Amino acid sequence: MDFMQEYEKWFHSPALSPEEHAELESIKDDPKEIESRFFGPLEFGTAGLRGTMYTGLHNMNIHVIRWATQGFADVIAAEGEEGKRRGVAICMDCRNHSMEFARAAAEVCAANGIHVRIFDSLRPTPELSFAVREYGCQAGINVPASHNPKEYNGYKVYWSDGAQLPPHHADAIAKRLEEIDIFDGVKRMDFEEAVKSGLIETMGDETDRKFMANVTAMINDRETVAKVADTFKLVYTPFHGCGYKLVPEALTALGIKHLIPVPEQMVIDGNFPTVVSPNPENPEGFYLAIDLAKKNDVDFILGTDPDSDRVGIMVRNHEGEFQPVTGNQTGVLLLDYLIGAMKRSGKMPANPVALKTIVTTEMARKVAESNGVKCFDTFTGFKFMAEKKNALEESGEGKVIFSYEESYGYMLGDYVRDKDAVTASMLLTEMAAWYDAQGMTLFDALNALYEKYGWYAEKTHNLVMPGLDGLRDMAKLMKDLRENPPTEISGVKVIVRKDYTDGSVIDCVTGAKSRMELSGSNVLRYELEDGTVILVRPSGTEPKIKVYILTQGADAAASNANLEKYGQWVAALKP
């Protein structure tokens, strides 16, 4: 694609607003900036689109939203009149322009004769997954950007099971988008006109009530919560986002009496004024929550990201300071707790199964299998876990009780097929209250699990490579690792190499080649002589290579020393 030609097309298009035209005028003498915005469209994948909000083909803006929706509408229409009648559910988060983008998507769907159910205001991502399933929709559209900085927005698409789009449908949309002109190929209908004609209807409190009835049905142990409710306290922050209403509702339904919200961060604001990045993975964002917790003698802090699909926790250690609990650790804590709680309450099904991703700690497998629960791996992303859950349950092979990935996402219950911070927040709080009744904090509980199951440690390194040069550097790094694979890492021999692109496995000791069940994802895996596993993959949503170190040792010091040692090799990868 000729980026200057594309720039000129946009610059002279009457579809642009005066503000958008002025924005393009301001970069006319900056060929590098023009190239970064117009060298090609954002890639439409199974996660949809995500990018920075600027005027340009490679950015998130109303023209790209309409164009993507036209492609999606064509795929929905291919299902016939029944698919159009079942329609699409649409949701949005707190970000700047999210409501505008969601309404624009609704207008395009309506113009294509597709019935639309759109939320009246921002809602948690899991509620969109729920709505697709609850109302029998053909598809779903969400306009969030999860935990990304304020400059970002996104466009996530779902299919009829409430999970993100399967690859063959994503490919069909991508192919269709190649044929659609971004300005002239899109159908549009006025929003209010579509409402009057019955093509668009809004969802609100009634859907909230239905969703929350399913969430609260997941409570295992109200009795223990009631025993400690007069003294148990927690601090909660939604980081200016969608969790502000339903997470407190869920905790109140659980029986929590002393929920202390962070007032500054309960304010909905797409600029996220109190944090650099609204990411519960980043401890820095919890500074207000920590101050509040110390003032109120609280041991447990809970934070959900802006679209309320991911949740992070912080706990007070024995020195009285708050420390983050990683997604890997949180998942292990919750899995171990749920197994016990479900057994105690009689809720444990026959043939229970836990799901995790290939980059998630092996400690989860140890916890599951030690307690009679099978554990299966999937690729990164809840669409793959939803797919595996559906397959296991439809075949009668197993009943999934918990699915999680290390990046702070947890899926529970049968009413959603995506990560769900509302339900997870409630069950994490139930778990914290249960341990409180045993005279333990979650810091104590985590150390008890290490003593019981082994000292595992994990670290994710993000090699950020922004811009067009970054995309090239990312591709080159993956190519170099395939063409010149390491024989040792930080002085320790690589004994097995796996490439998830084609499912190939090479035994580096014997030279034997074999195949694994999983294939079709750009991930490399190195298994080392000391039991450490290192995985390398490009992020699907951000300009960075992610490197995961999964290790264990005789104790905490030994496992942390391994993280440090292998981290030096990772740091040297960045160009």
Task: List where the protein language model places each region.
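Phosphate-binding and adjacent anionic-ligand microenvironments
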Residues: 294, 298-300, 321-323, 341-537, ...
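N-terminal small/polar loop signature for handling phosphorylated ligands or for N-terminal nucleophile
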Residues: 89-152, 257-312
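Conserved phosphate/anionic-ligand binding catalytic regions in large, soluble enzymes, centered on
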Residues: 38-58, 145-148, 234, 238-250, ...
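An N-terminal, well-structured beta->alpha segment
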Residues: 2, 7-105, 194-195, 200-231, ...
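Short Gly/Thr/Asp-enriched flexible loops that form oxyanion-binding sites at enzyme active sites
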Residues: 101-109, 152-159, 309-329, 364
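Gly/Ser/Thr-enriched, mixed-charge loops and adjacent short helices
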Residues: 33-42, 153-285, 291-293
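Glycine-rich phosphate-binding loop plus the immediately following alpha-helix
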Residues: 158-189, 328-351, 356-365, 421, ...
